[in-house]
Every structure is written in structure tokens, then in C-alpha cells.
């Protein structure tokens, strides 16, 4: 009688970076994903590194997440965003016009440093639970993503499932770009709405 040994699963190492203007909720997004917590007070981020073991697409990942310090003007690219970064979340807040306007400059800086316009990037409109304070419309975010040939999402860092979906979307784009997954993924828009503009259901992933 013969037996077949089960092949051990190995983890894929991937490094991603979260970038954006100050006070847009980058750290809240990272902490929600890596620690399943939402910070109850704001603390200025110098720069943090987080690690999470995550399973998606029948694969195990050791995901290193760099929470970069927000810059008023992205004249200096963060040193932590070395060439081994596989993908980016580019975050703005829907209640902060300046944070949205600077996204184009950050995107151009990323492409300039990496020299690869196809590097996976997700445009993330955060704080979609603050609907009554919105100054950046969803269509503007979608148009920016179209110009950058990137995916677009609106989320609130208060909702674990939404944040997890964003990181899985980025991982999927990374694996497709490396030929490890068939792509593109099925194009769809997940959108839920309610009559309350501050309801976190008023968010979109497309």
C-alpha cells in the first residue's frame, strides 16, 4: 500500500504601501486590516510597518504593509517604498478636496520612481460614512482611476469587510500582473445605498 504525502503550502511574500495626504485615514485602514481595530484618536504617523498572514485565492500570503507618513506635497518619495513594493493603495478622504487633488501628483511620482505604469494601484476614497460632509463625488474618483488605469473603491475604515476586500483586490491585481492568476477578474460594481448619507453602506467597490 502506498500513500501520497500532502504537499506543504508555502506563503508568498508580498509588500504593499499605503500612500496619501495627511489625515485621510491611512493608518486606520492599515490597522483595521492587520489588527481588526479602529483607532479612537488620531496620532501622526511617521512611518509604520505591519505584517499579516492572509489567505486569498487558495494561496497563503505573508503581507507586509507600509503605512507611510502623509505629506503635504510629495516632493520626496518615502524611502520605505523601495522597488520591492508590489502594489499601492492611494488614499484620499471624500471630505477633503486637497487630499483628492494631490492624488494625481502621488500617482505620477510612483510611476516616475518605478518606471512601470502597470504597477498595481487602487484608488481609495475613504470616510464614505461621512456622506453629509462629502466634497469629492464618486464619479470624480472613478474618473481619476480611469485616467490612472487603476481600480477604484470607496470605503470606510470602520468596516472590516470593506477594508479586507480592498486589500484582496490589490492582491488580486498583483497576482494577475505576475501571471499567477488568470485575469482580468470579473468586472462588477458592489454598491449599497441607504437614505442616510452617513450610512457606511453608501460605499462602492468597482
Swiss-Prot record:
Q: What class of enzyme is it?
A: hydrolase
The record's annotation in InterPro entries points to: P-loop_NTPase, Small_GTP-bd, Small_GTPase, Small_GTPase_Ras-type
Q: Propeptide positions in this record?
A: 204-206
Binding-site residues, GTP = 25-28, 42, 45, 126, 129, 157
- Residue window of motif Effector region: 42-50
Residues annotated as binding Mg(2+) are: 27, 45
Sorted alphabetically, the Gene Ontology BP terms of this entry are: small GTPase-mediated signal transduction
Name listed for the protein in its UniProt record: GTP-binding protein Rheb homolog 1
Gene3D superfamilies linked: P-loop containing nucleotide triphosphate hydrolases
Key words, A-Z: Cell membrane, GTP-binding, Hydrolase, Lipoprotein, Magnesium, Membrane, Metal-binding, Methylation, Nucleotide-binding, Prenylation
Name of encoding gene: rheb-1
Keyword set includes Magnesium: yes
NCBIfam families in the record = small_GTP
Residues in a coiled coil are: none
Its UniProt entry gives the catalysed reaction(s) as: GTP + H2O = GDP + phosphate + H(+)
KW Cell membrane (keyword) present: yes
The family database entries (SMART domains) matched by this protein are listed as: RAB, RAS, RHO
Protein's job: Binds GTP and exhibits intrinsic GTPase activity.
Amino acid at each position: 500500500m502506498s500513500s501520497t504525502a500532502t504537499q506543504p503550502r508555502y506563503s508568498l511574500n508580498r509588500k504593499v504601501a499605503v500612500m496619501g495626504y495627511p489625515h485621510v485615514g491611512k493608518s486606520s485602514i492599515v490597522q483595521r486590516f492587520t489588527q481588526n481595530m479602529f483607532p479612537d484618536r488620531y496620532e501622526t504617523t511617521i512611518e509604520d510597518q505591519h505584517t499579516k498572514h492572509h489567505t486569498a485565492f487558495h494561496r497563503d500570503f505573508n503581507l507586509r504593509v507600509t503605512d507611510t507618513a502623509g505629506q503635504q506635497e510629495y516632493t520626496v518619495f518615502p524611502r520605505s517604498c523601495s522597488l520591492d513594493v508590489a502594489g499601492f493603495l492611494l488614499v484620499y478622504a471624500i471630505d477633503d478636496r486637497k487630499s483628492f487633488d494631490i492624488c494625481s501628483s502621488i500617482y505620477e511620482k510612483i510611476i516616475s520612481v518605478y518606471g512601470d505604469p502597470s504597477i498595481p494601484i487602487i484608488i481609495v476614497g475613504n470616510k464614505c460614512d461621512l456622506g453629509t460632509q462629502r466634497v469629492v463625488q464618486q464619479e470624480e474618483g472613478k474618473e481619476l482611476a480611469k485616467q490612472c488605469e487603476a481600480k477604484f473603491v470607496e470605503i470606510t475604515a470602520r468596516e472590516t469587510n470593506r477594508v479586507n476586500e480592498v486589500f484582496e483586490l490589490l492582491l488580486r491585481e498583483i497576482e494577475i500582473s505576475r501571471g499567477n492568476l488568470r485575469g482580468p477578474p470579473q468586472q462588477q460594481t458592489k454598491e449599497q445605498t441607504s437614505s442616510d448619507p452617513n450610512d457606511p453602506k453608501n460605499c462602492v467597490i468597482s
